[in-house]
């Protein structure tokens, strides 16, 4: 188990890779790890190690979210490799929420594709504040004008979703070539492009001002039982600080429970405390594994309460964004993805509103079938039949 203390000499930032399936997100993640490991700034993680969820092997499609860590001269990074395939947008919704910034991977050979657009939209909706672009597979494009066109197209697409397209750093390179160089023990032109990318990430994605002053809150992503030690829940601390010995509540879905923190770990290393932005495992005293499920939150006692009914501002995707082709009516019952969980709920439209068309912004009242830890400002996605149909933010709690 974790023994070494986790060092905090460098500021910590959470980033991840997003983009269309097969544009090279996982290869880029492996290339960053390989190039930085040659400089003693990362532990080498190869492609298979990152692409490691068993169910994705036969299709070569990344489903699970992999976490790797590395450093630059300036910062320490936790990097998530987000799923790219449309069927796994659910994971993107929970995964992209873990980012202070994202590296959008776009194949220079193909240009932006439907999922490129969807991931930019999702980044906008789940609050990923900064995007840096890696134009991958540049070794396959001989025409400099074509590269320029793809770059312009990417900038326009970012701007259309309210990201500053004109100011966004776009680095072109080849993740595969960089990976091959690093494996051969060389530092060539392609590895230099990876270093350029990391320099852009270092300078363009600000070190986030952490919410350490606020009340502790951590959405639960996973629950494990460790024999002889008890139950561990993992997730990214959304705000506040948790220390060994703290009394905390487990809120949402079932009745609120109170427990005590007996350990905090990050990347298998023990810490005295975890703070906002950290991906941690929290050991809970006397809590049984079956009492805790994904979608609950750990929180400072009395700081957040479970709710079923709220008002929200939502944007309903149009069909070009992958949304519905038809309107919906009063009492529509989709799923609401809040933090790490999905709960069915019914939608009540405002008086005088007959229906909602794709592409509209509306205020709705939602009634969930199970209570979830909510507060004003909590963001969520609306999903139906395996696709995102809308996105919103809680504007007022009703009950």
From Swiss-Prot:
Q: Where is this region: G2?
A: 60-64
Q: Which PROSITE patterns match?
A: G_TR_1, G_TR_2
* Alphabetical keyword list: Cytoplasm, Elongation factor, GTP-binding, Hydrolase, Magnesium, Metal-binding, Nucleotide-binding, Protein biosynthesis
Keyword field contains Ribosomal protein: no
E.C. no: 3.6.5.3
Residues reported to bind GTP = 19-26, 81-85, 136-139
Primary location class: cytoplasm
Q: Which residues does the annotated region (G1) include? A: 19-26
The reactions it catalyses are: GTP + H2O = GDP + phosphate + H(+)
The UniProt family comment states: Belongs to the TRAFAC class translation factor GTPase superfamily. Classic translation factor GTPase family. EF-Tu/EF-1A subfamily.
Q: What does this protein do?
A: GTP hydrolase that promotes the GTP-dependent binding of aminoacyl-tRNA to the A-site of ribosomes during protein biosynthesis.
| One GO cellular component term noted in the UniProt record for this chain | cytosol
Pfam families cross-referenced by the UniProt entry: GTP_EFTU, GTP_EFTU_D2, GTP_EFTU_D3
Residues covered by region (G4): 136-139
Origin species, per record, is Campylobacter jejuni subsp. jejuni serotype O:2 (strain ATCC 700819 / NCTC 11168)
For the region G5, give the residue spans.
174-176
Name of the protein in question: Elongation factor Tu
Q: Where does Mg(2+) bind?
A: 26
| Any one GO MF annotation of this record | GTP binding
């Amino acid at each position: 188990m974790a023994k070494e203390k986790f060092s905090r000499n460098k500021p910590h930032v959470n980033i991840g890779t997003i983009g269309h399936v097969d544009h090279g997100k996982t290869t880029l993640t492996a290339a960053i790890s390989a190039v930085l490991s040659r400089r003693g700034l990362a532990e080498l993680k190869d492609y298979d190690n990152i692409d490691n969820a068993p169910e994705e092997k036969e299709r070569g499609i990344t489903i699970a979210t992999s976490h790797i860590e590395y450093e630059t001269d300036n910062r320490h990074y936790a990097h998530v490799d987000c799923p790219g395939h449309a069927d796994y947008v659910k994971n993107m919704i929970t995964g992209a929420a873990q980012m202070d910034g994202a590296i959008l991977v776009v194949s220079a050979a193909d240009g932006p594709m439907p999922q490129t657009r969807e991931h930019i939209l999702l980044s906008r909706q789940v609050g990923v504040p900064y995007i840096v672009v890696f134009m991958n597979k540049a070794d396959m494009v001989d025409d400099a004008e074509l590269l320029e066109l793809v770059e312009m197209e990417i900038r326009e697409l970012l701007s259309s979703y309210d990201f500053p397209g004109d100011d966004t750093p776009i680095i072109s390179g080849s993740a595969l070539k960089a990976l091959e160089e690093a494996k051969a023990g060389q530092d060539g032109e392609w590895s230099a492009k990876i270093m350029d990318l990391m320099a852009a990430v270092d300078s363009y994605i600000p070190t986030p001002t952490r919410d350490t002053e606020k009340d502790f809150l951590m959405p639960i992503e996973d629950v494990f039982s460790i024999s002889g030690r008890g139950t561990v829940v993992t997730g990214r601390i959304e705000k506040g600080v948790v220390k060994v010995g703290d009394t905390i509540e487990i809120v949402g879905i079932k009745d609120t429970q109170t427990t005590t923190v007996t350990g905090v770990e990050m990347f298998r290393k023990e810490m005295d405390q975890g703070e906002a932005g950290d991906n941690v495992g929290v050991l809970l005293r006397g809590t049984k594994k079956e009492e805790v499920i994904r979608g609950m939150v750990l929180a400072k006692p009395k700081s957040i309460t479970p709710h079923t009914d709220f008002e929200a501002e939502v944007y309903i995707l149009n069909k070009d964004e992958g949304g519905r082709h038809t309107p919906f009516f009063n009492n529509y019952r989709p799923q609401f993805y809040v933090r790490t969980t999905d709960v069915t709920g019914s939608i009540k439209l405002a008086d005088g509103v007959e229906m909602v068309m794709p592409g509209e912004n509306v205020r709705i009242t939602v009634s969930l079938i199970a209570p979830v830890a909510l507060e004003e400002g909590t963001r969520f996605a609306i999903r139906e039949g395996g696709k995102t149909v809308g996105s919103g933010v809680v504007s007022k709690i009703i009950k």
